[in-house]
Regions:
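Bacterial Sec-dependent N-terminal signal peptides
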Residues: 1-29, 310
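N-terminal, polar/Ser/Thr-rich
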Residues: 24-45, 57-59, 497-499, 503
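Ligand-binding face of N-terminal immunoglobulin V-set domains in extracellular IgSF glycoproteins
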Residues: 44-71, 75-76, 85-89
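Juxtacatalytic substrate-recognition/specificity segment
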Residues: 203, 253-365, 371-375
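Beta-strand-rich binding/interaction modules
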Residues: 214, 299, 497-500, 511-513, ...
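Acidic/His/Gly-enriched intrinsically disordered linker/tail segments
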Residues: 363, 369-456
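Amphipathic alpha-helical substructures
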Residues: 436-522
């Protein structure tokens, strides 16, 4: 029989280790920032403190910081090379005054200036050498003084435009992600894949009084002195801090029944045919039911985010064409409510998933995209099960003839479009494996075909299980904010999903099959399936 004292000691050690590990995981980086905007010179002057706690079980003597604004400094950065790969020439032909960069003046620990340098091939990554090792769970404070030259917004929609409007995201220097004992040194590639953990912010802005300032952070104080506005923000558990400076206040604030607040400039037509609050309430409530509630009190939904990654093909089916000075041709094939709801749904779920999951979004982008598409499929199944992909286009008459009605595409359900699009990509032989790193994918596969393929695959799993197993697993995954490995969570002894992870996502093989010699008898059906290489 085991000695009770030994048993007690072992139990105590196990509990202590568990609590210690949990404490390490729970520690968050805190940012205290004082920033002054000079919009005329396109500059931001920043004084910043980073309160960093070692999340590892080993001691550290090196820290890495991400300075993604510095990715805009010249044509030799990884971001510039990404622009070239995407055949975007505006960055290369722009004047130097349109580019962006960071001048880092000083970096201090509480007692000493620190040695730092930028990585040679990644000028948006900063390496800092600490004067002494930082023990597991120990905290240190870095003090930084730097100046940001804001890039022109024409490159990525982030930055400043010619009218002086400023949109900032991933703009301040932050600690690079640290996972599984390794630093993730990822440069800015304009992929919307910042992978840092949720952090706490205390931030004060000083800016010209011509501006209205909107943020996803909670505003706590606001005053004006000598033509300058001073606004203080404080918030916790934020993966990023977004700010919009605009001379016109284009945002609406909508309090929700659950106590949260939505702030958005993604608005419906001015005709008044859309009940904005009711539409937002329905989308938010559905997300809360399908997954888990949004992790923060304030929800910022940006039109610029939707414009950067819109619902593919939707706008082309909802427009008006001017055919003369006083006459327009109405090519609106969806109701204003449905059209706005889909745009809101796309933008909200994108914001929701990105702000909830603190995962490696460059390598695990397929999780983000798949959940996004899956959520939209489920929403349409719930509220618009009979909606067609082409809307009323199939009924559109030219010379009194409905030319599309007899074609199969006119019968496609709205959700059929996801499969239709990725099958088109496969038939064109331009598809790529979903599990490839995001920076290896073409833009079409990254934004459209890949997420569609993964989302439809998740819906296949749910239909095959015919129960609430998958929805409950997805809730569990989102409830833990990505701390559980998605693949490990779904791979269980009772569920054989090798086909999904190893074949459907990783290999992504396509097959060109043909059914021939079809025979039907009273009690059976016989046919042959022939592939492109004629094997049967």
């Amino acid at each position: 029989m085991q000695n009770p004292f030994v048993f007690f000691v072992k139990s105590f050690v196990c509990v202590a280790l568990l609590l210690f590990t949990s404490n390490l995981i729970a520690q968050k980086t805190k940012y205290k920032i004082d920033a002054t905007l000079d919009s005329e010179e396109r500059l931001i002057f920043v004084k910043q403190k980073i309160i960093f706690t070692n999340p590892d079980t080993e001691k550290l003597n090196v820290l890495f910081l991400q300075d993604w604004i510095n990715a805009y400094k010249n044509t030799q950065t990884p971001l510039a090379k990404r622009f070239a790969e995407d055949f975007s020439r505006s960055f290369y032909s722009s004047a130097k005054s349109k580019l962006g960069f960071t001048v880092l003046d000083t970096v201090h620990s509480p007692s000493n200036p620190l040695v730092w340098k930028r990585l040679e091939d990644q000028p948006d990554i900063i390496k800092i050498t600490l004067p002494e090792y930082l023990a597991p769970g120990a905290t240190t404070t870095l003090t930084l003084n730097y100046t940001i030259k804001i890039p022109d917004s024409k490159f990525t929609r982030m930055g400043i435009n010619d009218s002086g409007k400023v949109y900032l995201n991933h703009w301040n220097i932050v600690v690079a992600p640290f996972r599984k004992g390794k630093w993730q040194l990822q440069s800015n590639l304009n992929l919307e894949d910042y992978s840092g953990p949720a952090s706490d912010y205390e931030l004060s802005w000083h800016y010209p009084n011509k501006y209205h300032l909107t943020s996803n952070l909670i505003e706590t104080k606001n005053n004006e002195v000598d033509s300058l506005k001073h606004t203080h923000f404080s918030d916790v558990d934020r993966i990023q801090a977004d700010f919009v400076f605009d001379t016109s206040n284009r945002f609406l604030t909508i309090p929700l029944d659950n106590g949260k607040v939505v702030v958005t400039d993604l608005l419906p037509p001015s005709s008044g045919s859309v009940d904005l609050k009711a539409t937002i309430e329905r989308v938010v409530k559905y997300a809360d039911t399908l997954f888990t509630p949004f992790p923060n009190q304030k929800i910022l939904i940006l039109k610029s985010s939707y414009d950067k990654n819109p619902f593919y093909g939707l706008s082309q089916l909802q427009t008006e064409v001017r055919i003369s000075k006083n006459k327009t041709l109405n090519l609106k094939f969806f109701s204003d409510t449905f059209f706005y709801e889909i745009k809101l749904l796309k933008a909200y779920f994108g914001r929701y998933i990105n702000q909830t999951l603190a995962i490696d979004k460059r390598e695990e982008h397929w999780v983000i995209g798949g959940l996004h598409t899956y959520a939209m499929i489920k929403y349409i199944e719930t509220f618009y099960p009979d909606q067609k992909f082409l809307g009323k286009l199939a009924e559109f008459k030219i010379l009194n003839l409905t030319l599309l009605k007899k074609y199969s595409v006119a019968k496609l359900g709205f959700n059929d479009a996801y499969e239709f699009i990725y099958e088109f990509v496969e038939n064109s032989n331009i598809h790529q494996a979903d599990k490839q790193s995001k920076d290896k994918l073409s833009k079409f596969n990254e934004k459209i075909a890949g997420p569609n393929h993964v989302g439809v695959g998740l819906r296949y799993i749910e239909a095959y299980q015919n129960n609430d197993w998958l929805p409950s697993k997805l809730k569990e995954y989102l409830n833990f904010k990505g701390k559980l490995d998605f693949e490990t969570l779904l791979r269980t002894e009772d569920e054989d999903l090798d086909w999904f992870f190893d074949l459907y996502l990783k290999e992504r093989k396509s097959f060109d099959l043909k059914i021939k010699e079809f025979q039907k008898t009273t009690d059976s059906i016989r046919f042959k399936v022939v592939s492109r290489d004629r094997s049967e």
